[in-house]
């Protein structure tokens, strides 16, 4: 909204909307962002990121704040790595999001440097996956 107000030359409105945006981000992060730095067995390793995650640490809980620009800049890579870790280790390369998360999943993985994981999800043919549905259920 602050961008629209700025485009219209409404400086006071733009400042008010920008302030509200920052307060909303701060409140969201205060409630849902969990930061437990220094807990990884192998710091910096892709499969063992520090415990920096959102909500209940599901793929969707981590992907949506990335997609909506809510993650503080210094935590973006770690939140993305945490989503990748869940996909690879917990979900064994399978999609675990519902309709809300899946629409942002491949886009955010690719945007954050994990296009290989997005490709894995898109091409996986074991259950549960899109490839499995295409191969097994296309005759129905």
Which residue stretches match the model-derived regions?
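Active-site core of glycosidic bond-cleaving carbohydrate-active enzymes
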Residues: 1-140
């Amino acid at each position: 909204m602050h961008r629209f107000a700025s485009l219209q030359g409404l400086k006071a409105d733009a400042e008010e909307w920008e302030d509200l945006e920052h307060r909303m981000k701060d409140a969201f992060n205060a409630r849902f962002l969990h930061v437990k730095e220094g807990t990884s067995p192998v710091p910096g390793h892709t499969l063992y990121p520090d415990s920096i995650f959102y909500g209940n640490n599901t793929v969707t809980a981590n992907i949506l704040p990335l997609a909506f620009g809510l993650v503080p800049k210094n935590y973006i890579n770690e939140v993305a790595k945490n989503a990748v870790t869940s996909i690879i280790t917990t979900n064994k390369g399978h999609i675990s999001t519902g309709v809300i998360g899946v629409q942002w999943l491949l886009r955010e993985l690719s945007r954050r440097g994990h296009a290989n994981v997005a490709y894995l999800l898109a091409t996986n043919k074991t259950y549960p996956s899109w490839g499995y549905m295409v191969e097994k259920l296309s005759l129905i």
